[in-house]
């Protein structure tokens, strides 16, 4: 991000989570949130395209959208831009399922507990408190390892 847009990102801790929606035996996932200041340039779609290029460089091969959840080497998502609602064929912000995913909200709350993904919406902390996801989200590596 610093290379692409000249901004130094903040990074959450990494969190270990069960392989959500995957066949038994699929290794756990590592999740992390990265946050940076956005000055309205580039456009959100340009940011998303850059993230897709990074995925590709790291060995991800994308499959059809209707294939369901599949294990992958890397998955980068543009989750939200504080106070921005964005709906285009390519990108929806905030991420339409962000509020349902503890593995997203816990690391996000670590960095930006009080931001609102939509202008009048709940804070990240409030979304986390109301999140229906009961899956295990553990700090990685676990303390004491």
Predicted regions and their residues:
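Short, surface-exposed acidic-centric catalytic microdomains
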Residues: 1-43, 48
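Flexible, gly/pro- and Lys/Arg-enriched active-site loops
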Residues: 20-24, 28-29, 45-145
């Amino acid at each position: 991000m610093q290379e692409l847009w000249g901004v130094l990102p903040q990074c959450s801790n990494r969190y270990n989570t069960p392989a959500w929606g995957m066949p038994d035996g699929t290794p756990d996932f590592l999740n992390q949130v990265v946050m940076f200041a956005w000055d309205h340039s580039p456009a959100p779609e340009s940011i998303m395209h850059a993230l897709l290029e990074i995925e590709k460089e790291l060995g991800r091969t994308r499959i059809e959208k209707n294939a369901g959840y599949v294990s992958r080497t890397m998955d980068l998502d543009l989750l939200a831009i504080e106070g921005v609602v964005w709906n285009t064929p390519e990108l929806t912000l905030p991420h339409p399922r962000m509020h349902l995913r503890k593995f997203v909200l816990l690391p996000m709350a670590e960095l930006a507990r009080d931001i609102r993904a939509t202008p009048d919406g709940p804070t990240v902390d409030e979304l986390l408190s109301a999140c229906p996801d009961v899956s295990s989200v553990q700090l990685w590596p676990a303390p004491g390892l």
